[in-house]
Amino acid sequence: MEERYLELDRSRKNDFLYPFIFREYIYTFAHDHSLNRSILLENVGYDNKSSLLIVKRLITRMYQQNHLIISANDSNQNLFFRYNKNLYYQMISEGFAVIVEIPFSLRLVSSLDLERSEIVKSHKLRSIHSIFPFLEDKFPHLNYVSDILIPYPIHLEKLVQTLRYWVKDPSSLHLLRLFLHEYWNLNSLIIPKKFITIFIKRNPRFFLFLYNSHVYEYESIFFFLRNQSFHLRSIFLRVLLERIFFYGKIEHFAEVFANDFQAILWLFKDPFMHYVRYQGKSILASKDRPFLMKKWKYYLVNLCQCHFYVWFQPEKIYINSLSKHSLNFLGYLSNVQLNPLVVRSQMLENSFIIDKDSTMKKLDTIVPIIPLIGSLAKTKFCNAVGHPISKPIRADSADSDIIDRFVRICRNLSHYYSGSSKKKSLYRIKYILRLSCVKTLARKHKSTVRAFLKRLGSELLEEFFTEEEQILSLIFPKVSSSSRRLYRGRVWYLDIISINDLANHE
């Protein structure tokens, strides 16, 4: 092992991001980015008040007043935040998130140094679905899994301190403290949960950046210990903190184990330990006995609590068998199923047949129908028990706009849940959306559903079929067994980079 793996990357230590805050194109870029993101439903939280005129007014106010020096006494008297506080705060936070991501992107590109085709491949790994082929390949060979809820840091100043290792710009960090000061009192020890919820809804990109940068710091140390203990080096991992003292402690730790605890050295050499983080949770999975899982669980908990002041609850972290426990993972219920197989061998010379029963492990991904119906009921597509209802609309809405809206939601859900191993629940969701669309149109035209369908014909329902379903219906006859198997097969897409409440049932 070499110490350079624990040194801070100082190749771009002169990054000065503060002047970008006063550039109009930064806010335009942030606005376009939030508008063009891939979503499953509608971006109902999008603020239509964003415009270039408001950006210019915002920048003018930032130039005219000194907002970077603030005390607890005069914060309530600051005219900048008293005037349209929430809108200006949201715009600056989105612009700040775009700006502060610049050094992250530059370090990523310079560290990878890949060919163009490999860069395209790495972009595909951003897709949410890219994790499921990995799970299909690895999880059937594993036995135990632990689902860990990652808590928020107990103090917002910890988020700023983490960012200091990335951004060498005191002005930008001071502005960040000002933003956080306006939402919470930095002298408080605990972040109120209701304020976290409000902050996430109003500034999703800004919060996710701060949260991910903080989580990545302790994950980098966790991965470093894991990779070094297996004598493997990850080319995609760059530890960005100076942890020479920590490195020395690790060497001493390994030396003590070698001298006094030789019998359990295998604990740190298990090649089947896997770590996956998604949203606010992480997964530890292993092939070996639960003893190994307990050791790594307590190491992760102690590392986060002692060095990063993130409070875990070890008693609520359970180690479960993959064959008996389902993971609520990115909108899917995933577990490992034992599928029975029959192997038939026939000897031609002696003319006898040998039948052998066997089992094969397979990752099973199911659409959680009850949470999905709850999401549809919350957005007024059906009632609490799943019966489709008409959705209230404006009287001047065109029929084509209403149909396009329902079709877009239905196709996006079909696109996201195309990896389900059982399509029955997905068919029910499509049925709810189709009938809700018909009832909405019939209500607008003051007609019954039967009369409206009779007048419109079956063309309306054909709009709800996805492009993949239309292609399969043209290539294969529906009566053929090969068509049914292909149509029911799992398909993972590499162009889905975000989800909304219909897929996020947490």
Curated annotation (Swiss-Prot):
InterPro entries: Domain_X, Maturase_MatK, Maturase_MatK_N
One Pfam family named in its UniProt record: MatK_N
Primary location class: plastid
Bilayer-crossing regions: none
Top-level taxon in the UniProt lineage: Eukaryota
Single Gene Ontology BP annotation: tRNA processing
Compartmental location: Plastid, Chloroplast
Disulfide pairings: none
Annotated Gene Ontology cellular component terms: chloroplast
Keyword terms: Chloroplast, mRNA processing, Plastid, RNA-binding, tRNA processing
GO molecular function: RNA binding
Family indicated by similarity: Belongs to the intron maturase 2 family. MatK subfamily.
Role: Usually encoded in the trnK tRNA gene intron. Probably assists in splicing its own and other chloroplast group II introns.
Protein name: Maturase K
The encoding gene: matK
